[in-house]
Structures are given as C-alpha cells and as structure tokens.
C-alpha cells in the first residue's frame, strides 16, 4: 500500500483520464486507489477508475466496474482484474462524439453467459458487462457505477459518454483558469468578459465535434452570484442597475455561469419496415 501511495503521488503531476490497478492488487490497495480517484475528482481533476465489481458497487460517476467471470481468450481464462487495464485503454481511445457501447473486443472468444434480463439487470445495477454476438465480444453498454442520483444530478450521468463530456469541460475550465487567469489579470469586468469569450469559444468547438448540442451553450458573468457577494460584503445594491451589479468590483472573486446540452450517442433504435 505504501508503494501504491507513492506511485499515485507521482502521477498526480500528470493528466490522467482512466486508471486501472494491477491484476494482483490487494483489497487494501484497491480501496486506496478508489480513495485516491475520488479525492482527485473532488479537486476538479478527471481520473476515472476501472476496477472489477465486488460485492457492492462504488456508486460513483468516476468509477467503472467490470463484472465478468466467463471471459476466454482462446483456451485461456481471462480474469476481470487482469482485463480492467484493457477496458481502460478502450475507454480512453473512444472519440469524444462516440460512446463505448458495442466497442469491439476481438481478442475475447467468450464472455460471461447471461440471459437478456440478466444483461439488463446488470446494466441497470451500474455494472460494465460484455456480450458476444456470435461474431465478436463487445461492451454491452457504456455505464459507470453510479446508482444514486445526487442532488442536482441527472439520470444520464450513469453513462460513461456523458461523464466524459462533463470531464472535458471540467478539465478545460480548470486548466484554463489555473494556467492563464489566476493572478494574471486585474479583476475587472472587461477581463471577466475575456474569460467568458474563451469559454464560449471552447463550447462552440465542442458543438462542432458533436459533444454539445449546437446553439444551446452559454457563458456569462453570474449576476446572481455577483449580487449575493455584494450584499454579503455590505454593499447597498438597492440603487444599482443590473449592469452596474455585473460591473461592480468583487475583490479576488470571479463569478461565471456557463452550460450547454450534452449530446448522447445513438444506442437505442426502433425501425419499422412496411411490406407494401
């Protein structure tokens, strides 16, 4: 565990999208890796842990849990713990406009046999499972381990693709603000608008790439947050116009609100054929 902690400390200097432990990881090391992942995500970093499903799920958007006991590669059995790194690599390589659902795993010749209802139950239970269609093995549905929707959260946060888009935005905002803005500009309204313009430009790029729905993205100085900050700091706002509140000095604080609609991938189809 000490060696793992030291290794995790070293990789904190890098940007990590997906991480998986070694096949021989102990329970204590697995718990430490989970703890590290959640702590990093609390700091607006974006690692996602791929690990074997245990008796209880992690119930977190940053944890993907592989529940497979019947994988074969030729005549060789493949364990979930040894295959998590492969899944992490697959997920890391999915283009931003696509999902991992039905991502092929051609080296596997067999996966855990499940009925249709068992497949659906596993997916609904936050487990990443595999299916074999008679031609090749593939990921059944790209879901993470989240089961409990947090306050302010949405059902589609259970999807790896949606969380990946959220993490793209989180990564951009964090690295841009930390690298280009903190301590580098006077805190004026005009300079806040420079940041707003940068965010909007990035959102427009994501719209072109199919990550965000075109025309719905926005970024602006947060009027409500400015208003509340001014009142909390003893400023009489009763005679101020909306624009005056937006332009008022806010010390070291910059309040921005932004958003957009994340686009999901095509995964569920209904096609009707009329025999004329």
Q: What would you call each of these model-derived segments?
A:
Residues 91-110, 118-276:
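Structured, hydrophobic secondary-structure cores that serve as assembly/anchoring elements
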Residues 1-104:
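Extracellular Cys-Trp
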């Amino acid at each position: 565990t000490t060696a793992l902690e030291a290794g995790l400390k070293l990789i904190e200097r890098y940007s990590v999208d997906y991480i998986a432990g070694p096949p021989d990881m102990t329970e204590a090391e697995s718990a430490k890796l989970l703890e590290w992942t959640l702590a990093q995500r609390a700091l607006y970093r974006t690692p996602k842990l791929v690990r074997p499903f245990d008796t209880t799920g992690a119930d977190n958007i940053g944890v993907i849990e592989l529940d497979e006991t019947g994988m074969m590669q030729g005549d060789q059995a493949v364990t979930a713990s040894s295959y998590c790194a492969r899944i992490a690599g697959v997920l890391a390589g999915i283009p931003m406009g696509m999902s991992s659902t039905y991502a092929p795993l051609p080296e596997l010749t067999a996966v855990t046999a499940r009925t249709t209802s068992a497949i659906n139950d596993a997916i609904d239970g936050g487990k990443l499972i595999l299916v074999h269609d008679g031609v090749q093995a593939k990921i059944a549905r790209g879901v993470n381990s989240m089961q409990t929707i947090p306050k302010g959260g949405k059902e589609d946060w259970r999807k790896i693709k949606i969380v990946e888009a959220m993490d793209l935005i989180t990564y951009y905002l964090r690295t841009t603000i930390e690298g280009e803005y903190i301590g580098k500009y006077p805190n004026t309204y005009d300079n806040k608008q420079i940041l707003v313009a940068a965010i909007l430009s990035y959102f427009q790029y994501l719209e072109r790439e199919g990550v965000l729905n075109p025309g719905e993205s926005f970024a602006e100085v947060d009027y409500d947050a400015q208003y509340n900050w001014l009142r909390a700091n003893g400023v009489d706002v009763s005679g101020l116009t909306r624009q005056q509140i937006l332009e008022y000095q806010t010390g070291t604080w910059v309040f921005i609100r932004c958003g957009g609609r994340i686009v999901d991938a095509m995964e569920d189809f209904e096609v009707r054929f009329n025999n004329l």
